[in-house]
Amino acid sequence: MPQPVSAQSAADQGRRSEIAVGVFQHGANFHPLGDRLIFDLPQLPPGEIYEGSEEDGTVDVQLLYRTAPLQFLLKPRLSAKVQISTAGRTSFASGGAEWRQHILRGRLYGQVGIGLTLHDGYRFTPDPFAAGLPAQEAQRRYDIYRRRTSFGSQVLFNPNASLGVRVDRRWSIEVAWEHFSHRQLFSDQNPGIDNIGIRLSRTLGR
């Protein structure tokens, strides 16, 4: 049975490393850093799709490790995570830092983070509309065009944020946002992608 969370136990657990597992919507229409949300895009002709939406609506599983807070630079936690597509789309591996702030005697917390990401997807997808392609090759490229996003770089930035509720001294539940893009630093192609999900986190140690 879950044990009540005291202010002291919440503080103690906040000084330990953590592991977490999450489920995310891959390609969610949510971006809090300035781009406006668009829910009523006009319908495109058959066979065409909006750039950056090729992978929208699929499901990812995320595995995450956080260190205990470091004792400098506002006490960040270093993080390592993999976000694996269950639909054969782009998967991500990231490393970074997260900063956490507790409220309500440690029962609730918010955190923001930034990281660098490598992915197994496409920097640029092959052009299915190039002249002179054999039909089989054109179809192969078109299938990629419909299902995979051109990120413009294999290295991406990963701003992220989450809100957590501590259930007991070891377990917490988080609602999380993960963004991947490169701000057009590496090429003009930069659709970016946003993911929204929920994580179950466990504090390590006794």
What residues fall within each predicted segment?
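Transmembrane beta-strand segments that form the barrel wall of outer-membrane beta-barrel proteins
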Residues: 19-25, 45-46, 75-86, 177-181
